[in-house]
């Protein structure tokens, strides 16, 4: 158990200064470098940024990002990560909500962000080399101060900034390092982008355990040949990803224990782990333990989990998402908010120290999703589950029209909102198509097109996707667009999304 994330990482630097903290394709950075660089950056940030304000950090999978995060934490600032593969619109949308006084350019910004201070890479590098280090951690992020703010999809096309405090993160990290059997010095894969809270599952537990993060940038993961060649060279003990990503790795017949002798832990979150994927991993990696975990960003990465053994795979065609972590209470309610009996489907409620204080600058959405339970915070997950009498939870679906595709959470209304801005579209509605394992296989849009000059639907679809791609993240672009003269409506005049869902999943 640790009592402070920042001092725990600094302690590793004091005890094991030459140990490698971060390895980017063979370029290695030690804990001493991480401490010295983050201390100097913290000194620089303390002088140059307004006290206590959240700061946007723009960049990819690099050591500099981690160093900047830690420098901001030490100087009393929450960080708001935005990945380099985000559309330009995302940066503007986040800033419209966050009103951050500064943007830190670890990688060059693709657009101009008006009325905000920009700290560019040369200034960062100069500060990390020569600025006087921060003289104490008395103003560092602690307790209920925000540690990071991650933006998720929002229903109005406006993303929601989930505020995660130091103590939220501490609760999660302590559970991760105690319940998943990870050892000091663990070598962990660092693949999810920092703007996706799954990245927290590898980042902070690894650093407080004095381990090594092996960066796997998108340029590698997008090229399967390069990915399959790179993975065995990493010497991993721990694999953290969405199930979708490991399903890509399983396409390589050489992805098995004999080529990964030290790989002993698989941790999954972000979407449903299906039975056949778990079975493939258990068969190919007999020395490894497969952990299935579940949790919304609003409750800090994950709140339930369990080891998926051969017995569990044999017993449950649809795998459980595990038991609540010890400091957290989960329970299931019906539409009236009444607790239901064991085995009855309902909405999962989460109460505990890892539940967020709410959405940044969005009191209405916060009031709708969060509640007080005694002296603790609670969150209405919007997830349909069943729970056994002994507390084992099974995921069943969403209560609303929010889905997960490849681990990314997508509000269908958000996609619709943007699709309906596209110049070729009169009206559109997006629905998920599920595969036989109840996972979202693709997004399909039904659209009423405006009059146009395209000689084929294919060309029209290409034009719509190109325009939409300037507004939303790549994973939010529907794979197929089906054209109609009109969309079905409900009795109260809204597009009947349930009818469209039924049509594509018949």
From Swiss-Prot:
Subcellular location field:
Cytoplasm
Q: Where does ATP bind?
A: 152-153, 292-297, 383, 395-398, 494
Note one Pfam family from the annotation.
AMP-binding
Task: Describe which pathway this protein belongs to, using the record's wording.
Answer: Cell wall biogenesis; lipoteichoic acid biosynthesis
Give me the residues that bind D-alanine, please: 197, 301, 494
Give the catalysed reaction(s), semicolon-separated.
holo-[D-alanyl-carrier protein] + D-alanine + ATP = D-alanyl-[D-alanyl-carrier protein] + AMP + diphosphate
Recorded GO molecular functions are: ATP binding; D-alanine [D-alanyl carrier protein] ligase activity
**Which example biological process does GO assign this protein?**
lipoteichoic acid biosynthetic process
Q: Which CDD domains match?
A: DltA
Record-linked InterPro entries: AA_adenyl_dom, AMP-bd_C, AMP-bd_C_sf, AMP-binding_CS, AMP-dep_synth/lig_dom, ANL_N_sf, DltA, DltA-like
Q: Which UniProt keywords apply?
A: ATP-binding, Cytoplasm, Ligase, Nucleotide-binding
Q: Which GO terms describe its cellular component?
A: cytoplasm
Task: Look up the EC number in the record and give it.
Answer: 6.2.1.54
Tell me yes or no: is DNA damage among this UniProt entry's keywords.
Answer: no
Family label: Belongs to the ATP-dependent AMP-binding enzyme family. DltA subfamily.
Q: What does this protein do?
A: Catalyzes the first step in the D-alanylation of lipoteichoic acid (LTA), the activation of D-alanine and its transfer onto the D-alanyl carrier protein (Dcp) DltC. In an ATP-dependent two-step reaction, forms a high energy D-alanyl-AMP intermediate, followed by transfer of the D-alanyl residue as a thiol ester to the phosphopantheinyl prosthetic group of the Dcp. D-alanylation of LTA plays an important role in modulating the properties of the cell wall in Gram-positive bacteria, influencing the net charge of the cell wall.
Entry protein name: D-alanine--D-alanyl carrier protein ligase
